[in-house]
């Protein structure tokens, strides 16, 4: 896939394959093209060239809502939600409109509460307006809303941003739990301990180009990756 924005090539001939029940970590410096790549896959922005195939079907150019119904859901870097809806109502939107088989309202409410519980959202705040939730709660709500569409592939854009180490560890455990339900995951993270802790493979982008793709410890010992990215991290 290639994406050009004006005179900038944000993503340059990147090939990426995600297997069943696999967690793929996507890392790279700021401006490397990571979020743009997720936006291409989810239909938010079309590629300039190349195509996106999902479950054997070419979904290039489909609108985001249709791609969601095909089985791809996405969370966003900034945890925002409809401020005047409750947490439960927000997840119900995903249950009712995120796929082609919508249940009745009573069942949608039940499913929404179950999904909120699955992501460790405090159920005593299920009727709280989203404007009154804290960052951790908004992150979990955003994840619940994505899961409500029953995706086969989940795209996570910096899920742990704004979380403390304990909360990040809980997020890692939750990501593994989601994968164990049969959902493949493509995750962008700057926290290398998170990426190393959850990923089956790590893909590294730099200036829109893929410079590495392999098992976590192969990638972090790749000299080009160290020079362009990991050199900034004392942990390595």
Regions found by a protein language model. Give the residues of each.
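Glycine-rich phosphate-binding loops of nucleotide-dependent enzymes
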Residues: 1-236
């Amino acid at each position: 896939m290639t994406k050009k924005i004006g005179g900038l090539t944000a993503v340059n001939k990147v090939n990426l394959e995600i297997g069943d029940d696999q967690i793929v970590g996507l890392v790279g410096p700021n401006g490397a093209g990571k979020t743009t790549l997720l936006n291409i896959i989810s239909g938010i922005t079309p590629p300039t060239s190349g195509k996106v195939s999902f479950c054997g079907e070419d979904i290039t150019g489909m609108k985001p809502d249709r791609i969601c119904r095909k089985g791809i859901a996405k969370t966003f870097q900034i945890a925002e939600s409809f401020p005047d809806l409750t947490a439960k109502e927000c997840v119900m939107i995903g249950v009712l409109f995120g796929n082609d088989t919508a249940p009745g309202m009573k069942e949608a409410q039940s499913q929404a509460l179950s999904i909120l519980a699955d992501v460790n959202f405090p159920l005593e705040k299920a009727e709280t307006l989203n404007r009154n939730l804290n960052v951790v709660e908004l992150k979990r709500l955003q994840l619940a809303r994505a899961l409500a569409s029953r995706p086969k592939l989940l795209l996570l854009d910096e899920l742990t941003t704004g979380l403390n180490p304990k909360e990040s560890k809980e997020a890692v455990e939750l990501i593994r739990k989601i994968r164990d339900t049969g959902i493949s995951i493509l995750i962008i993270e700057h926290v290398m301990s998170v990426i190393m802790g959850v990923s089956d493979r790590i893909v590294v982008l730099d200036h829109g180009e893929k410079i590495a793709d392999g098992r976590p410890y192969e990638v972090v010992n790749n000299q080009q990756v160290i020079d362009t990215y990991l050199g900034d991290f004392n942990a390595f």
